[in-house]
Amino acid sequence: MCIRDRTWNINYPSVVKNYINITPPGGGTVVPIQNLICDIRVLGLGVTTQNSNGSINYIETKAQIKYNGSASWTTLYDGKETDTLVQQQGIVKTYTVTANKPIDFGGQYYYNNAWSTFRSSTSSPTLVWALVNGDTCPNRVPDYNAPSLETFLKNYLDSSNKVRIGPMDVIIFMELTHTVTTDVGYDQQDCVLLVSFRTS
């Protein structure tokens, strides 16, 4: 978390890795080391189509979670970038999570009257990434000043494309529309969540 005024900037180091592990390294599965509470926000939903006049349509997107040893997925949020709760980046769900039980994240979008293929942190290749404060963004997330960087990410990155979040936060990036890294649409920002852990 950064506290700012006109003349100073303090960046608090991440301590969340004292409480969770991310597996595999660079992957998207979060494993609590102890029982924790997590508050989850949708920072943004970036699946879009473009109309013939150049205007953008935001597409319904569903974010899901699997936790505490469950074999089934639970919906975190189902909606669009333009929804008020997403725009305000408010808490969408709060869960109590159990030590040593993996937390996985996934998502899909609804287009042409059908749901897309479900992508998750258990998928291969990896299409979901979990990062903490100070980590370098996934390599296909556009640079901080690039026009293709989603506006909703601006407050969570610094100018060197490192993650800038609170010391007990984990940010989740999802690529839902492409699997080939050279595709122009592969930008790792189709669904972005902020998971804030606490002990009570």
Residues covered by each model-derived region:
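Extracellular carbohydrate recognition
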Residues: 182-192
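Structured loops at beta-to-helix junctions and adjacent beta-edge loops in soluble globular domains
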Residues: 175-177, 196
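Short beta-strand-to-coil "C-cap" segments at the C-terminal boundary of structured domains/repeats
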Residues: 194-200
